[in-house]
């Protein structure tokens, strides 16, 4: 007992010591086991801060696609909502109002039909575009299952015909979350191969891969690799033509990056709900939505595109609450931040910011191409990034360095511009996006 008392008194005395004079600072803390005793707040903070100090500076990370700065007023509002669970709308009704208003604003921005606008807008906030894509993909899969069930119930249908495996058509340059969706939800991924002339979706080849078990086609508005906008107009026309063959194939637009760019930088571009076969769109608020991570959005054309199986109602928190997200609890801060940005910037503000980004892209493209060392892979119409690769050496000589070496040298100077390999069908090409 005396030993325990002495130990407690020693710990109490240590609380008065300067941070770097305390014993805990010198103790090795591997994190392999749960700590037996706690630390003073100042020591715990210092240990965490010191370990993070070796990380890259987010503002010098030129390839993360993530917002790294917000106004002080936005940060204040988000900090005030740190302890709020957004799912508890009975206790925090303002957060659900903000979310619904953001969905309605996005439905308007994406030209949803009258039945999917205002209070009728169909969508939800998510923790990122991955969750939004899972929801969009699940909606397409369930709708496909419902169509297949109706076909089996028709007079003369072959009741003994085995059920086919659902498949999803997408280019090889999709983000990894699409691979996860197919793996998690038992969907066959059908990848349209990329090549040096098709860095994004080859629409003609995609249409040729569609069959009666295709739940939908993914069109990317802003490729992770090169920033390309895929040709959603051609995709829409193609799946429309397939209806004459009895094939009903919806389009989901992966607008993780581009859905917050195209409406402002390229307002005449056709890609959204103006096209009749686009049924759902995801967007990342923490990318060009200009909010700190993580927040994403899923917006459907209207509620008829949302299967009832996706909607759950619970009364855990004191009232009957409908939910269409995969994740249950989530912080309210990012929703508050997104609503602030929509109010603060409006169309005019977002247009000005996207125009500035496009000008920066043009400037960097000209400077990088002007060195004569690089081939530009990104397009004029697309995400405001510059994707490039080293030109082959003249005379067939072997180069002593590659894009990964270039990325390492930039990292030595404090800049994060990671190089990565292009989709597997494109051989011997790497692209550092900037």
Question: What does each model-found stretch correspond to?
Answer:
Residues 1-120:
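N-terminal entrance/gating region of PLP-dependent enzymes' catalytic architecture
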Residues 99, 103-106, 132-141, 178, ...:
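Buried hydrophobic packing segments
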Residues 276-278, 291-294, 333, 381, ...:
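Short, solvent-exposed loop/turn segments at the edges of secondary structure
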Residues 82-90, 116-124, 163-165, 189-193, ...:
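Glycine- and acidic
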Residues 124-312, 317-320:
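Conserved PLP-enzyme active-site core in the AAT-like
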Residues 99-106, 174-179, 202-210, 327-334, ...:
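Structured alpha-helical segments in the cores of large, soluble enzyme domains
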Residues 45-49, 183, 187, 194-196, ...:
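Conserved C-terminal alpha-helix-loop-beta "cap" of PLP-dependent enzymes
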Residues 291, 324-340:
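PLP-dependent aminotransferase class I/II
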């Amino acid at each position: 007992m005396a030993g325990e008392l002495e130990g407690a008194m020693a710990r109490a005395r240590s609380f008065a010591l300067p941070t770097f004079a305390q014993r805990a600072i010198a103790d090795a803390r591997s994190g392999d086991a749960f700590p037996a005793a706690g630390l003073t707040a100042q020591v715990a903070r210092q240990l965490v801060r010191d370990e993070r100090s070796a990380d890259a500076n987010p503002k010098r990370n030129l390839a993360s696609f993530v917002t790294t700065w917000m106004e002080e007023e936005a940060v204040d509002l988000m900090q005030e909502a740190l302890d709020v669970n957004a799912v508890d709308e009975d206790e925090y009704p303002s957060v659900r109002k903000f979310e619904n208003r953001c969905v309605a604003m996005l439905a308007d921005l994406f030209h949803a039909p009258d039945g999917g606008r205002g209070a009728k807008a169909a969508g939800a906030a998510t923790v990122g575009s991955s969750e939004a894509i899972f929801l969009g993909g699940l909606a397409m899969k369930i709708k496909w299952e419902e169509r297949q069930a109706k076909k089996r119930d028709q007079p003369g249908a072959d009741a003994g015909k085995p059920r086919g495996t659902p498949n999803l058509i997408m280019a090889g340059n999709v983000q990894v979350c699409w691979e996860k969706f197919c793996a998690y939800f038992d969907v066959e991924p059908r990848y349209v191969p990329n090549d040096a002339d098709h860095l994004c979706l080859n629409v003609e080849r995609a249409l040729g891969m569609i069959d009666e078990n295709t739940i939908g086609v993914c069109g990317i508005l802003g490729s992770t690799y090169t920033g390309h906008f895929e040709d959603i107009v051609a995709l829409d026309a193609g799946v429309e033509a397939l209806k004459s063959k009895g094939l009903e194939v919806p389009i989901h637009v992966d607008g993780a990056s581009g859905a917050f760019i195209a409406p402002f930088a390229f307002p005449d571009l056709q890609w959204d709900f103006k096209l009749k076969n686009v049924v759902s769109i995801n967007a990342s608020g923490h990318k060009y939505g200009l909010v700190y991570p993580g927040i994403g959005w899923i917006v459907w054309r209207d509620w008829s595109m949302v299967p009832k199986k996706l909607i759950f109602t619970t009364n855990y928190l004191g009232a009957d609450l409908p939910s269409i997200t995969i994740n249950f609890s989530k912080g309210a801060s990012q929703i508050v931040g997104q609503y602030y940005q929509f109010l603060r910037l409006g169309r005019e503000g977002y247009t000005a910011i996207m125009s500035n980004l496009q000008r920066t892209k043009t400037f960097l493209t000209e400077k990088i191409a002007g060195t004569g060392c690089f081939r530009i892979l990104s397009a004029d119409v697309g995400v405001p990034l510059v994707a490039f690769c080293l030109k082959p050496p003249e005379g067939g000589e072997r180069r002593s360095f590659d894009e990964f070496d270039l990325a390492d040298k930039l990292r030595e100077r404090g800049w994060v511009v990671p190089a990565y390999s292009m989709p597997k069908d494109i051989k011997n090409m790497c692209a550092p996006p900037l």
